[in-house]
Amino acid sequence: MSAKSTARFTPAGQLTAEDLGAIHLIGVGGVGMSGLARLFLTRGISVSGSELREWPSLAGLRALGGTIYMSHEVANLDGVDTVVYSSAIPQDHLELVEARRRGLRVLHRSEALAAAMTGRRTVAVAGTHGKTTTTSMVTMVLQQAGVDPSFVIGGEISEVGSGAHHGTGEYFVVEADESDRSFLIYRPFVSIITNIEADHLNTYGDLANLEAAFADFARLTDPDGFVVTCADDAGSRRLAETLRAEGRRVYTYGTSTDADLRLTEMASSTRGIRYLAEVDGRSLGEFRLPVPGRHMGLNSASAVLAAYLLGLPLDAAEAALAAFPGVRRRFERKGVADNVLVYDEYAYHPTPIALALRTLREVAGDGRLIVVFQPYRLYRTRDLQTEIAEALAIADELVLLEVFGPGELREPGEGSAALIEAVPLPADRKVFVDSWEAAPVEVARRARPGDVVVTMGAPPSSLMGEQLLDALSARRAGSPVGTVPGGEVGGATTIGGTVPGGSAPGASAAG
């Protein structure tokens, strides 16, 4: 591991959560930051946070004793010892600047999380995609085995309503983010790497550098621990070969005949997925998931393999996966209105976009699949435009929002206007809407009974599901098609950078 890659982050093990004193989190409402705040609050640590939007997570933080400021002000830092920020916060943010002026301890989210993990056996889940779902599955398997792990997940486990927990057991399960190299500060006992594909090229430049970073991450694994990765993924296979040549403990899973945990008779339907698992020709039994998709089966296999290598009872893994409720924003069913089924999905990289849309096409059956997509990050939309466009074309119809890219500088010609031209769908089956309110109206105009609609992409798009259901219900009730929740028609109100510069209302057809 090069010193350059982690120069601005403090490695794990140098701080404990109690060393941090009173903690303030800038932008506390997002899933990652709110989970961290919840973890500290349940450990009895004083926590405050600042936010500009009333995220659903904030009520829970207040109930735990957190102080939430609905503004960014220097006065928010009074009485604070440590200020925590995420990569979404610009370095010139007034609270960050003031914290440094006052000489307060300033930590990146990953550094604060590393402090919380001190003294525990860390199970870190990394990968280009599938991290949140896999971290959730591993967590539930450990919970079912009775070891009460602590965890911080980049999402909320459905029906649990939280992405963080302070447990009493020795294990701490964490989702490790490669986007800014911050995963290189962790010192895992178990490292799970789901896959390695081109992404975050603004940080790494090319795939070779990204693969090198994942190799560095794997090398940080405790010598008494092990690495788990996917034999069905080309990047992960290359990683496994490299690590084995270095004499490291690495184990693979997948349908490949040379996988250490081999999956056979895998079958997926709209009701879920099942497979048989074996090690060295010895059956470990049948495993079932109530969520569909081959990729979900592969994610779950990493949890089975980790449990097997940790010596945990596999009946716990079988039971946990059979009851897996899913993760919010990962193939999440939002509801039905006017016989149109609405889902929400976090996918924004071309591979998970394609996987999710193929699975949803099975769900749609004879109905059509309509995707409402908000690209996440200008650099990704630019670097992977062709691949994203091809993945979106799996849908029958596309409603495209402007790119969500907080803190990014927009160059001329960048954004969703360029992306929609690249999507190989007929002009009448794709549309770019330049306001948030226009999207539900457009979906209500296009969707027919029996269709499936999915909101997909950047975090703000998760807020649209209820609006779509309201618009479809209003259509059924005979309300004007242009009516949106709140009684407005059209409009150009933006959410979190949805429409740069305050575009005019309405929808403009692609073509």
Curated annotation (Swiss-Prot):
GO term, biological process aspect, one: cell division
List where in the cell it is found.
Cytoplasm
Q: Under which EC number(s) is this enzyme classified?
A: 6.3.2.8
**EC class of the enzyme, as a word:** ligase
The UniProt regions of compositional bias labelled Gly residues, in chain numbering, are 484-504
Q: Does the keyword Metal-binding apply?
A: no
Region (Disordered) residue ranges read 481-511
**GO MF annotations, alphabetized:** ATP binding; UDP-N-acetylmuramate-L-alanine ligase activity
Question: GO terms for CC?
Answer: cytoplasm
Its protein name is UDP-N-acetylmuramate--L-alanine ligase
| Gene from which the chain derives | murC
